[in-house]
Regions:
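Gly/Gly-Pro- and Ser/Thr-rich, intrinsically disordered tail segments characteristic of DNA damage-repair
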Residues: 1-204
């Protein structure tokens, strides 16, 4: 059992798409769940400047990527359902997530609208085994708020975020300092946090 301070990184899976899907289901009970079909949240298609802001897991199977022009995404998947973003809804859902996290710790540090760190002092004494508690928290978020998250666990924010980015969706991963050689060193350099294209090119 780990007794030191631990940090969780909580990252909402396909946040804008998930939150748009929930809002649609709330307004139209029984309607199609956007998360179960090829769908995307995107900008104004008529201006020809619309891009994919978020996409569903089924949309990913068509090779659709975040930031891709919607016209390109539609060529890959002609049946793609596109909905406009609703940032008021996204802020509301983000606040709901942070409020839930604050039931367990006051140290909730936002990283973006769909990501946050939660810091826990004397973790083992308070919460027991990290992965067991993280899975309990993950399930509570899904059952209470209606969307899934990845949770990364470590002793610092950087490693916790990198852990959360391993495999998605709806999973818990650890990346403690002693696990770095086994879990991180064999990954492509692109997996390094904050490593841009030029940095990756030099490192290769």
């Amino acid at each position: 059992m780990r007794s030191e301070k631990l940090i969780f990184h909580i990252d909402v899976n396909s946040a804008f798409l998930s939150w748009s899907a929930l809002e649609r289901l709330r307004g139209q009970p029984g309607s199609l769940d956007l998360r179960t079909v090829p769908s995307a949240v995107g900008g104004d298609e008529e201006s020809r400047h619309g891009v994919v802001l978020a996409k569903s897991t089924p949309a990913k199977k068509y090779g659709i990527t975040t930031g891709e022009p919607l016209a390109s995404a539609r060529r890959k998947c002609p049946g793609l359902i596109v909905v406009k973003p609703d940032f008021a809804v996204y802020v509301e859902q983000s606040n709901r997530l942070r409020a839930l996290l604050r039931r367990y710790t006051d140290a909730v540090i936002p990283y973006s609208i769909d990501e946050a760190w939660a810091e826990f002092e004397n973790f083992g004494r308070m919460y027991g085994e990290p992965e067991a508690f993280a899975n309990k928290l993950r399930c509570e978020i899904k059952e209470t708020l209606g969307f899934t998250v990845n949770i990364g666990i470590s002793t610092n924010r950087l490693l916790a975020k990198m852990a959360g980015d391993f495999k998605k969706p709806d999973l818990v991963h650890t990346l403690f300092p002693e696990e770095v050689p086994g879990k991180l060193w064999n990954l492509p350099v692109e997996h390094l946090l904050f490593a841009g294209k030029s940095t990756c090119k030099r490192l290769k």
